[in-house]
């Protein structure tokens, strides 16, 4: 099995062990404390539910727990910062008391990130790559925490109006390069950055598949690569219509492809199932000439 080269990175986290990226693929488990997320909305609204899910993910092998309190699915209704904080604070407090793995806050709002970081989150995952809220980059710089910069265009309620590309892979790479520069200008150290091509965000199904099929090209950005294909609707271009949980088989295929192309982190909903996929894909990498 010939796998793409995967460079190693060490991403520091204040007050705890760094993320060591490269020797094996890290698994990020998703917990949405929302009533309307496309895959698991409503399943973790209660802090005790969020805690139990996080404990199960950690026990299954999750390396990071990603907590979000606003659905960013296409067409989702925006949530104000006060409501987002009210949702995320009790969840992060409960999760941080129950698991030792790093917690990531999935938000594009500086005020939400600040509240989450104060309660134990130590990574910021921003779908807008510091574009929606100009205060988020400086906040990340101040705290010295890792940041995940995801690619999108427009806002969740109009992103598909921006899904026009002549060369989707080249343009996503160029946009991420601009995001990296935006982070630099905000004072964020390059060694703290992780990039995410944003499958399903401002991309039609075939465009997401094209990005997924060309992940090796993102190596030119020389940063750790996170991929989030989990249960996304772009898979319907290959499978036909399926419910979110029925997309786990497609997710497994996407995760395997991403790892063989050099992805460092995969973001998934079903950690218990996907951890086995990740381990087999890593075994294929280690058996190949480019491991």
Feature names for model-found ranges:
Residues 52-68, 261:
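Catalytic domains of carbohydrate-active enzymes, especially glycoside hydrolases
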Residues 2-7, 13, 22, 39-53, ...:
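Active-site-adjacent loop and "lid" segments of alpha/beta metabolic enzymes
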Residues 35:
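Catalytic-pocket segment enriched in acidic/His residues
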Residues 199:
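Active-site metal-binding loops of divalent metal-dependent hydrolases
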